[in-house]
Amino acid sequence: MTQPISSRLCLAAALVAALAVGSMVAAERSSSAMATAATRFVNALTPDQRQQASFAFDSDERLHWHFIPTETFPRKGLLVQSMNESQRKLAQELLKAGLSQRGYLTATSIMDLETVLGALEAAGRSVEAQPRSAPLVRNPVGYFFSIFGTPSARDTWGWRVEGHHVSLHFTVVNGTLVASTPSFFGSNPAEVREGPKKGLRILGPEEDAARALLQSLDASQRTKAILDAKAPNDMLTMAKVDISPLSPSGLPAEGMNATQRDLLMKLIDVYTGYMAPDIAADRQARLRKAGVEKIGFAWAGETERGKKHYYRIQGPTFLVEYDNTQNDGNHIHSVWRDFDGDFGRDLLREHLRTVAH
């Protein structure tokens, strides 16, 4: 027996509400694990190291971010290279607190890939987007950990890990994780084509899931999804602090059949799945609450594998950008952004507005 429309709407509303409550409880669990890991990390540092790693929560440094090499974007924080072995393990435990097992493996694999990139560049087998007078130093321990405020299971604080091709940001307000964006992963090379790690594609799922969706589209759908035969040279939002929705948004999910919508959600799952399971569930709950049917998929560039290409996924509240054009189409940049939620700024504004200080 078919339920009345009003009953189905009530059921849908109840489901969204349950997802929201569940994700909030989950976010509190995740923030507690982060607070414990961050406290252990900070307590293991020397006074000088602690000074390098620690910033006021309201410091401008918290919004200072990028994904390019440190030589071209000077960074602050405590460098992994300057940590002893036990401190490095504690830093890794903090990273694990924010990421899933796959996300942690992805982040550390990207860091390790710096060694491969350095060898390729030394042999003249990696194409730079812009020639440099001096080669960049590729360093798998050239990543910085930063703590903003005092880690606590009840208070407001945040943390960041950043270096070439990894930039992860987490913000906790009153003991609840409210933001895990911007979150950036990159890979150069996108595919290792020689040497002991030949065939390695760290961010392969990001490309493969997008191609599966693209290939499922018919000619009419492709005219809406494919924006340009040429891909942009990089992500359009780059490392801006404030971003706005991009136009056009491409083919909306409401214009897809059920199979294609499933492929779209599998693509989104690739990105949410980098985060700890409870953080991923929170992202999923938010985008569903805003309306899956409003999510758009757009592509630019070649459709043949191995060629330069770009895509984006955009909903009412979030944007995913992926670009693979540098190094002759073998260098990926990808990011998840929240239009109002990056760095937790929207909830922080609401918190400051409603709470007396």
Language-model-detected regions and their locations in the chain:
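A cross-kingdom marker for long, charged
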Residues: 27-100, 105-357
